[in-house]
UniProtKB/Swiss-Prot annotation:
GO terms for cellular component: plasma membrane. GO terms for molecular function: ABC-type D-methionine transporter activity; ATP binding; ATP hydrolysis activity. The gene is metN. Residues 9-247 form the ABC transporter domain. It comes from Chlamydia abortus (strain DSM 27085 / S26/3) (Chlamydophila abortus). The complex is composed of two ATP-binding proteins (MetN), two transmembrane proteins (MetI) and a solute-binding protein (MetQ). Its EC number is 7.4.2.11. This is Methionine import ATP-binding protein MetN.
Length: 341
């Protein structure tokens, strides 16, 4: 059992170069037991390379990685893959199933390889357990060719977790799935975290999934961490233009309204229960400003609803500054969008 107060993953000043080309640069972060951490970024930003470093598939040029008790202080080729795979599991979008084996045989295979002392009865018990968890028990004797894309991906995750790992690394595992299958897989990943306490690192370009699943998120750009923090804070108050672009917020505001000289476009973020509409009414009644609500929505972050409004704030500069300050004092996250050029 790992100490809940100590990181189960610790990365310090990680660098990776291939043929004198910098892939990763000074990457540092920690993941604590039970967290689901997302990694987002444009194609080529280094997300998958970082995940492969965490899985000890490639050795960093410099820096250190500690994951589930394994450390890069030892050359990775000297680390037992069998022992490593019992604690750290890796799933990619390709699934990697044996086509000539049934669903049951695919899931049982790693147990037979990694745990030769395990009895046939115990193997069957563990495989049946994950089959029931993923609602695949009725498909246990089916071959991969008879499965849907979503079912194949769930089998791949079942293979990864049947050995009871402490960490699950997921690389774009929903990218080839239809929306219904994606939702099913994401729900199972969340359930794995809640019921079995499996720490997860989730690489994805699908922002809605990251918002739903991940408590913390790393934003990568050109091999470096551009920004990191609680996922909802990155969404509500991004500090980086890259983060803002990935969450599509600047384009949303520009597409809604082109503001005038004495107007500002604001994005107001607020948790459930904060009566932001009443606050806006009070500000308008105070005089000197007008607030036009342009759009609004509710987003779920790990089942916690957070809302936002995009508004046009009009009035003199002093009155606008007072209105923004008043909203912030009441707990509203205020994000100002730059005027289009």
């Amino acid at each position: 059992m790992f100490n809940q107060n100590s990181p189960i993953i610790s990365v310090e000043q990680l660098n990776k170069e291939i043929a004198n080309h910098r892939i990763l640069h000074r990457i540092s972060f920690s993941v604590y037991p039970g967290e689901i951490v997302g990694i987002i970024g444009h194609s080529g930003s280094g997300k998958s390379t970082l995940l492969r470093c965490l899985d000890f598939l490639i050795e960093p040029t410099s820096g250190s990685i500690s994951i589930a008790g394994f450390h890069t202080s030892s050359p990775i080729e000297k680390i037992s893959r069998t022992a490593f795979a019992k604690r750290v599991a890796y799933v990619s979008q390709s699934c990697g199933l044996f086509l000539a084996k049934t669903v049951f045989e695919n899931i049982a295979y790693p147990l037979k390889i990694r745990c030769p002392e395990m009895t046939k009865a115990l193997i069957e018990e563990k495989v049946d357990d994950v089959l029931h968890f993923f609602n695949l028990y009725e498909r246990k004797h089916a071959y991969p060719s008879r499965l849907s894309g979503g079912q194949k991906q769930k089998v791949a995750i079942a293979i990864a977790i049947v050995s009871d790992p402490r960490v699950l690394l997921c690389d774009e595992i929903t990218s080839a799935l239809d929306p219904r299958s994606t939702e099913d897989v994401v729900d199972k990943l969340s359930q794995l975290n809640e019921e079995r306490g499996i720490t997860q690192v989730f690489v994805s370009h699908e922002i809605e999934i990251v918002k739903k699943l991940c408590c913390q998120t790393l934003v990568m750009h050109q091999g470096s961490i551009e920004e990191s923090g609680p996922t909802e804070q990155l969404f509500l108050n991004p500090q980086s233009a890259i983060t803002e672009e990935l969450f599509h917020m600047q384009s949303i505001a520009k597409g809604i309204y082109e503001h005038g000289e004495n107007e500002e476009i604001l994005r107001l973020g607020f948790p459930k229960g904060l009566a932001v509409q009443g606050m806006i009414s009070q500000l308008i009644q105070s005089g000197g400003i007008s607030i036009n609500i342009l759009s609004g929505d509710i987003h779920l972050f790990r089942k916690t609803p957070l809302g936002f409004l995009i508004v046009a704030l009009s009035g003199g500069k002093e009155q606008r500054d007072w209105a923004k300050s008043s909203l912030r004092e009441k707990g509203v996250i205020v994000k100002q969008f730059q005027k289009s050029r």
